[in-house]
Curated annotation (Swiss-Prot):
Gene Ontology molecular functions: ATP binding; ATP hydrolysis activity; calmodulin binding; metal ion binding; P-type calcium transporter activity
This protein's name: Plasma membrane calcium-transporting ATPase 1
Species of the source: Gallus gallus (Chicken)
Membrane topology listed for this record: Multi-pass membrane protein
Compositional bias of kind Polar residues: 1183-1205
Keyword set includes Translocase: yes
Region (Disordered), start-end ranges: 296-343, 1145-1205
Topology feature Extracellular, residues: 126-153, 372-403, 862-868, 934-956, 1013-1024
Length: 1205
């Protein structure tokens, strides 16, 4: 261990010698502290007693005060950093630019091109003996210099293009890496921790913590440094990240005071003195070791990667992003993380599959091209021209074969979409950067894209939907219900004394109210917001809680039962001077009231509190408060007389019972003003919002109505946690998916829920197979116990302000403002990523199809590709790197929220896109072939076809090349719209990158054509020829308008491409129109069809039911992820026939909106999200049958017709 110590001390960049010399002013050395922190439990206690006496002794040696902390003097901080190190673990060195260049060179297609170019170069300098070139066929026998010059220029130009492609790729990777390092440091800066300095409690960045700091530790913290406990309340730590021990470890001064960095506080609170930071902390030591061993592992991994890369060939290039949560994360990650991994991101899966398919097709085409060229040449030379094979002709023939090989490789280069991973990376990187401005700090790249597919959001209430600024607005004190805060004199003196002491000591001492930052502003609430509301209540009663706290400091508290999600209450025991004990308790009113056997009456004396009285208070006080959306808290106490033996404090159930109720208060937490609008947007976008909260059901329902999660007259479900558990579990208490499936489609509010309930709900929705598309669930969480739900969800959002470190660790995105509207922005960005990729694909596949067909046909007919290797590489650069940059950086618009989610199995290339790809490819091929075979006549120039081996560039082929590039440039503008919109220029000037790239490419094209000469096989063109090229290019814009006029539904032969998962055969009728796809050209057509659709709806329903039964036989055998179909007709609950289960009414019987059917009939036409799942129980089957037959549920084709209008 000693070696290890030296190792990491050296690592921290401060020389050992300096440290040891300097320790003189502190009574303890770095090495001593490190060896102390390696001990646990009793060993550590013995060592502390032996060397330092007690923890106070360590504080003395570290020159710090347990109550006042460090002075915060800059000189002192600097000295401590010099001796004990900074709280910073050096990150792994980033890859250098040269390493990234080397990685880019590993691309298989580029390696083939490099070899071909080198062979071409070598042969161009080879002069065959004798002058019999004329016997060898059609070689251009001009001046020897010119011939050799032309020969080497092509090889050199290919090499140069390869260098360009490699440099651009490496630069992109480098800037991406730089950006994510910036993101990482931003995440680190966001992390703050509470310490005491100069007697003041302040929050400082984790990196600024130094040895000797007194840090406050509370529930949910991720400890940033090693330390020793000075004072603790019921502290339990999860040390599994360091020790692998799954049980929570109790920490106390007399058992085990050692707190280690990287561990999570699962319960309780306390204070510790920091004894080791950075590379000297337990986490730091492990990181240092990993850093040393990491390089060797990296080399091993690279070897493996090379093997797989060689095997996968071009297809390997298509892995868009090795994401944090990708299935193919390396083994090391698996070992290090004991949390469940999420499955591969949807887009990644689809892209990988599509790219492999394109790669295979490209490989096939290039192979056929080379074979045809070689055969044609051999047959023409040997049989047609009857030339003998002469030894001196061999090099020249080899040059021909190399030329054919280069053509084949360039066909492959153009066909293989290397730009695909680049487009994904750029789009995600661009989005992540911009999302930061929208208060979304993305931790895992995939999450950004997955959010675009989200179909359900399970949101917390407090702080996300509400403002998290809590105030007491009503109170029930001395048997009187005050609708506003009572005057202090209205409350009997002894009740006031109980209130003041009970609230002051039974709220965490970290919760406090500070004066406003600006004059006239609101006071600042620090710590738990509910506790701040209670402290604020005391201030409203003209009492100061701080006086009580000064009198009873935290160390004097005898025992604290801290708040957790199981208890839903907090209790504190005080020891009085006469030896008696008093316990104060506060918590959810219905929970604490059940433990109350007495209540303080109007004269302030305790009187008997019977169950009947409790029911009266619930009906007359608590329910009215809750129905106004108030959170109700009950305050109570109990005395333990002095004469009796001291209670067994660990036996909580016997202690916190037989209480006397002091008061019940109603706390208001107003709904954020922007939330109702954001929820409407979600519902319009086909996303169901559910509220999961710990509050009681009436409070939750009232808030849900205010937010718009529930609307009056709807028959959606509101359940409490225990009711939810009763319905989803069988007699043995096991959760059954079938039971969850009967509840979740209608569930909108889950109240009084524990984190386990939240996890169960999320898992149930994700695992459900009742819809064709698997649900994509986003979850918000702030508590330590929300970790499992955040991990299980497709996208986990943690609260940046109220969230615990544990929740942030488990999340994918951190909401820096804790606001629900930021989630809606994340949806918008996610859908934008999807659209950006689709735009790029639409553009690229058009170029691919045209370039491959032109090269292939040209090669077969004229033994030469009309587009030369270097030109192809330039086109490749345009369409891969530059187009991916241009199209992947389009900003999102509100229109993205008018569509339903794409769904996991929706193909990347929709039928509208397929129509655009084939339509534009047709136009471009007609233009190119017309120019290729009739260009010389049209422009009255020499033909470039059948030119000899080293002929100078021809005007003819230059016009073909130039027109081809112009068509791509204008088609890039067309590619901006993928849903059949007419106006392709809409918002074009909002995207400066797009305009810059299009103009830049145009300028470079002019330079290449006019001055490129032999290297680019270009000849200068006249103004007239240029105008023709541009005119034919602009033709793609007009042609695009013509294509968008043709309704997609008429083109039955079109299929989609790029399915992420295995795809079933779908009957042709069902393919008539995509559910989520809005082709704007069809809107006019649709209006007339709606009545017709309505008339046919019942028949369609019956057909769907039959289809459902037919397909479910097969679908039941498949995994949920692999089932895929474009429609999710058959699984809508309207079409499900319930079995003879015992019927449980699915409306909570306390629901105020029980007369839903009558109200519903009188309401205006349903909103997109209304009655999302109309029939969920046999009880409603008869009453709702007619409605379900004529209503359209979101996701059904009819519904998409109605809403699109």
């Amino acid at each position: 261990m000693g070696d290890m110590a030296n190792n990491s001390v050296a690592y921290s960049g401060v020389k050992n010698a300096v440290k040891e010399a300097n320790h003189g002013e502190f009574g303890v050395t770095l090495a001593e502290l490190r060896s102390l922190m390696e001990l646990r439990a009793t060993d550590a206690l013995h060592k502390i007693q032996e060397c330092y006496g007690d923890v106070q002794g360590i504080c003395t040696k570290l020159k710090t005060s347990p109550n006042e902390g460090l002075s915060g003097n800059p000189a002192d901080i600097e000295r401590r950093e010099a001796v004990f190190g900074k709280n910073f673990i050096p990150p792994k060195k980033p890859k250098t630019f040269l390493q990234l260049v080397w990685e880019a060179l590993q691309d298989v297609t580029l390696i083939i091109l490099e070899i071909a170019a080198v062979v071409s170069l070598g042969l161009s300098f080879y002069q065959p003996p004798g002058g019999n070139e004329a016997l060898c066929g059609s070689v251009n026998v001009g001046e020897e210099e010119e011939e050799s010059e032309a020969g080497w220029i092509e090889g050199a130009a290919i090499l140069l293009s390869v260098v360009c492609v490699v440099l651009v790729t490496a630069f992109n990777d480098w800037s991406k890496e730089k950006q994510f390092r910036g993101l990482q440091s931003r995440i680190e800066q966001e992390q703050k921790f509470t310490v005491i300095r100069g007697g003041q409690v302040i929050q400082i960045p984790v990196a600024d913590i130094i040895v000797g700091d007194i840090a406050q530790v509370k529930y949910g913290d991720l400890l940033p440094a090693d330390g020793i406990l000075i004072q603790g309340n019921d502290l339990k730590i999860d040390e599994s990240s360091l020790t692998g021990e799954s049980d929570h470890v109790k920490k106390s001064l007399d058992r085990d005071p050692m707190l280690l960095s990287g561990t999570h506080v699962m319960e309780g609170s306390g204070r510790m003195v920091v004894t080791a930071v950075g590379v000297n902390s337990q986490t730091g030591i492990i990181f240092t070791l990993l850093g040393a061993g990491g390089d060797e592992e990296e080399k091993e991994k690279e070897k493996k990667d090379k093997k797989t890369k060689a095997q996968d060939g071009a297809a390997m290039e298509m892995q868009p992003l090795k994401s944090e949560d990708g299935v193919d994360g390396d083994e090391k990650d698996k070992k290090r993380s004991n949390l469940p991994k999420k499955e591969k991101s949807v887009l990644q899966g689809k892209l990988t599959k599509l790219a492999v398919q394109i790669g295979k097709a490209g490989l096939l085409m290039s192979a056929i091209t080379v074979i045809i060229l070689v055969l044609y040449f051999v047959i023409d030379t040997s049989w047609v021209q009857k030339r003998p094979w002469l030894a001196e002709c061999t090099p020249i023939y080899i040059q021909y074969f190399v030329k054919f090989f280069i053509i084949g490789v360039t066909v492959l280069v153009v066909a293989v979409p290397e730009g695909l991973p680049l487009a994904v990376t750029i789009s995600l990187a661009y989005s992540v950067k911009k999302m930061m401005r929208d208060n979304n700090l993305v931790r895992h790249l995939d999450a950004c894209e997955t959010m675009g597919n989200a179909t359900a959001i399970c949101s917390d209430k407090t702080g996300t939907l509400t403002m998290n600024r809590m105030t007491v607005v009503q109170a029930y004190i001395s048997e009187k219900h005050y609708k506003k805060i009572p005057a202090p004199e209205a409350i009997p003196e002894n009740i006031m004394a109980y209130l003041v002491t009970g609230i002051s000591v039974n709220c965490a001492y970290t919760s406090k109210i500070l004066p406003p930052e600006k004059e006239g502003g609101l006071p600042r609430h620090v710590g738990n917001k509910t506790e701040c509301a209670l402290l604020g209540f005391l201030l409203d009663l003209k009492r100061d809680y701080q006086d009580v706290r000064n009198e009873i400091p935290e160390e004097k508290l005898h025992k604290v039962y801290t708040f957790n999600s199981v208890r839903k209450s907090m209790s504190t025991v005080l020891k009085n001077s006469d030896g008696s004990f008093r316990i104060f308790s506060k918590g959810a009113s219905e929970i604490v009231l059940k433990k109350c056997f007495k209540i303080l009456s109007a004269d302030g004396e305790p009187k008997v509190f019977r169950p009947r009285d409790r029911d009266d208070i619930v009906k007359t006080v608590i329910e009215p408060m809750a129905s106004e959306g108030l959170r109700t808290i009950c305050l109570a106490f109990r005395d333990f007389p002095a004469g009796e033996p001291e209670p067994e404090w660990d036996n909580e159930n016997d202690i916190v019972t037989g209480l006397t109720c002091i008061a019940v208060v109603g706390i208001e937490d107003p709904v954020r003003p922007e939330v109702p609008d954001a929820i409407k947007k979600c519902q319009r976008a086909g996303i169901t919002v559910r509220m999961v909260t710990g509050d009681n059901i009436n409070t939750a329902r009232a808030i849900a109505l205010k937010c718009g999660i529930l609307n009056p007259g709807e028959d959606f479900l509101c359940l409490e946690g225990k009711d939810f558990n009763r319905r989803i579990r069988n007699e043995k208490g096991e959760i059954e998916q079938e039971r969850i499936d009967k509840i979740w489609p209608k569930l909108r509010v889950l109240a009084r829920s524990s984190p386990t309930d939240k996890h169960t709900l999320v898992k149930g929705i994700i695992d459900s197979t009742i819809f064709d598309q698997r649900q994509v669930v986003a979850v918000t969480g702030d508590g330590t116990n929300d970790g499992p739900a955040l991990k299980k969800a497709d996208v986990g959002f943690a609260m940046g302000i109220a969230g615990t470190d544990v929740a942030k660790e488990a999340s994918d995105i951190i909401l820096t403002d804790d606001n629900f509207t930021s989630i809606v922005k994340a949806v918008m960005w996610g859908r934008n990523v999807y659209d950006s990729i689709s735009k790029f694909l639409q553009f690229q596949l058009t170029v691919n199809v045209v370039a491959v067909i032109v090269a292939f046909t040209g090669a077969c007919i004229t033994q030469d590709s009309p587009l030369k290797a270097v030109q192809m590489l330039w086109v490749n650069l345009i369409m891969d790197t530059l187009a991916s940059l241009a199209l992947a950086t389009e900003p999102p618009t509100e229109a993205l929220l008018l569509r339903k989610p794409y769904g996991r199995n929706k193909p990347l290339i929709s039928r509208t896109m397929m129509k655009n790809i084939l339509g534009h490819a047709f136009y471009q091929l007609v233009v190119v072939f017309t120019l290729l075979f009739a260009g010389e006549k049209i422009f009255d120039i020499d033909s470039g076809r059948n030119a000899p081996l080293h002929a100078p560039p021809s005007e003819h082929y230059t016009i073909v090349f130039n027109t081809f590039v112009m068509m791509q440039l204008f088609n890039e503008i067309n590619a901006r719209k993928i849903h059949g919109e007419r106006n392709v220029f809409e918002g074009i000037f909002n995207n400066a990158i797009f305009c810059t790239i299009v103009l830049g490419t145009f300028v470079v094209q002019i330079i290449i054509v006019q001055f490129g000469g032999k290297p680019f096989s270009c000849s200068k063109l006249s103004i007239e020829q240029w105008l023709w090229s541009v005119f034919l290019g602009m033709g793609t814009l007009l042609w695009g308008q013509l294509i968008s006029t043709i309704p997609t539904s008429r083109l039955k032969f079109l299929k989609e491409a790029g399915h992420g998962t295995q795809k079933e055969e779908i009957p042709e009728e069902e393919l008539a129109e995509d559910v989520e796809e809005i082709d704007h050209a069809e809107r006019e057509l649709r209006r007339g069809q709606i009545l017709w659709f309505r008339g046919l709806n019942r028949i369609q329903t019956q057909i769907r039911v039959v289809n459902a039964f037919r397909s479910s036989l097969y679908e039941g055998l498949e995994k949920p992820e692999t089932r895929s179909s474009i429609h999710n007709f058959m699984t809508h609950p309207e079409f499900r026939i319930e079995d003879s289960e015992p019927h449980i009414p699915l409306i909570d019987d306390t629901d105020a909106e029980d007369d839903a059917p009558t109200k519903r009939n009188s309401t205006p036409p349903p909103s997109p999200n209304k009655n999302n799942n109309a029939v969920d129980s046999g009880i409603h089957l008869t009453t709702d049958m007619n409605k379900s037959a004529t209503s359209s549920s979101p996701g059904s084709p009819l519904h998409s017709l109605e809403t699109s209008l």
